[in-house]
């Protein structure tokens, strides 16, 4: 048996929201292999993967034999090629359950939706082994070793958001739900809307940014936009709509069509409007406005009110894996962002700004 992992994007501390949550596999069936059900064959040849989990993947259409979607009762033959996608499961970390308060927006037997605060790392690793969302979920779900243990009740990440981005995340409670939600993310049918504050006065009331996103070769913790002809990066699309203008900054709603690492941050920076106070992409410096000391102090006060990139995952919608009905969740913009936005609103009302269309 020849097993090949086609890719696994687990580099450094930054992972792709969608692609980093999946592993792609290929199994080449040996010439001497006797006929066997494909689900049994896969469970036998995959480490730490149950037959039940394989059957869930087959049910969701993740498994292909000789490039055709397979059913669980299909018998494989010598020379067959099995290709499949499995939602990624980290291994090798023992999770410490921690009683950390969680803002759970919704919960049932299949999944929960949590409103993550800014500053909380989603998953342990790379210097963050405690105080993460997974540590908190482990305690909440009553699991001794947390979401890395072989426990069917475990919380399973389907996507993630950056440490300093606040907002909604869905966490599956079982394999069937994870695979169903993973498929929806994979097919880009999930509704994800963010609210951001960006530098500059965006010219158009709404627009679409399309550009491949890949790692910056000069900084492994940054990403950049590549032209199609470069053949680098992954296809990414962000739709934006202006919500409020303050001359030197703009409040926008961003809708993700894809979910690449730092996608909104990279795309907005690419068109000359980095997120307010986004240190990694140039938003933690004064990009627009006057040179006067009072203005510089005003900006510093805004940075202190919202000491992170001004980005909140506000809306999350998807088809409920159990009922098949569309379900959507909304969250309030957190206090640090609203305080900063209010300060800008007051500034414009009392001081005004220069016209700064771009």
Regions found by a protein language model. Give the residues of each.
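RNA pseudouridine synthases
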Residues: 1-217, 333-345, 351-352, 356-358
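Short, glycine- and charge-enriched coil/turn segments that flank and shape catalytic ligand pockets
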Residues: 32-33, 148-151, 230-232, 293-302
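Short glycine/serine/threonine-biased micro-segments
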Residues: 59, 117, 123, 129, ...
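Short Pro/Gly-enriched beta-strand edge/turn motifs at strand-loop
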Residues: 84-87, 220-222, 235, 295-301
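Conserved hydrophobic positions within beta-strands
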Residues: 104, 198, 239-242, 275
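The conserved catalytic core of RNA pseudouridine synthases
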Residues: 151-183, 190-191, 214-273, 304-358
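RNA substrate-recognition surfaces in RNA-acting enzymes
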Residues: 275-318
């Amino acid at each position: 048996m020849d097993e090949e992992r086609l890719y696994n994007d687990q580099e450094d501390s930054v992972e792709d929201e969608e692609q980093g949550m999946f592993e792609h596999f290929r199994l080449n069936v040996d010439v001497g292999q006797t006929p066997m059900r494909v689900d049994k064959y896969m469970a036998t040849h995959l480490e730490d993967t149950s037959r039940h989990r394989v059957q869930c993947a087959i049910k969701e259409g993740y498994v292909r034999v000789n490039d055709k979607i397979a059913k669980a009762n299909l018998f494989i033959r010598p020379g067959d090629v099995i290709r499949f996608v499995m939602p990624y499961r980290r291994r090798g970390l023992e999770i410490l359950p921690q009683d950390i308060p969680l803002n759970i927006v919704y919960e049932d037997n299949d999944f929960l939706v949590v409103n993550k605060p800014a500053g909380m790392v989603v998953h342990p690793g790379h210097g963050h082994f405690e105080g993460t969302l997974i540590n908190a979920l482990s305690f909440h779900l009553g699991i001794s070793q947390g979401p890395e243990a072989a426990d069917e009740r475990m919380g399973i990440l389907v996507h993630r958001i950056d440490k300093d981005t606040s907002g909604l995340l869905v966490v599956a409670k079982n394999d069937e739900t994870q695979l169903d939600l993973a498929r929806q993310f994979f097919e880009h049918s999930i509704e994800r809307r963010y609210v951001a504050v960006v530098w500059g006065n965006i010219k158009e009331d709404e627009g679409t940014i399309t550009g491949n996103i890949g790692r910056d070769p000069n900084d492994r913790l940054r990403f950049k936009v590549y032209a199609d002809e470069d053949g680098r990066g992954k296809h990414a699309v962000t739709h934006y709509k202006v919500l409020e203008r303050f001359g030197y900054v703009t409040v926008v709603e961003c809708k993700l069509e894809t979910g690449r690492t730092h996608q909104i941050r990279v795309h907005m920076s690419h068109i000359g409007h980095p997120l307010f106070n986004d240190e990694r992409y140039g938003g933690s410096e004064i990009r627009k406005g006057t040179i006067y000391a009072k203005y510089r102090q005003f900006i510093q006060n805004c940075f202190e009110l919202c000491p992170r990139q001004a980005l909140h995952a506000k809306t999350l919608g998807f088809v409920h894996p159990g009922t098949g009905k569309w379900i959507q969740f909304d969250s309030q913009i957190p206090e640090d962002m609203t305080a900063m936005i209010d300060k800008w609103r007051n500034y414009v009302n009392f001081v005004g700004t220069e016209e700064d269309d771009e």
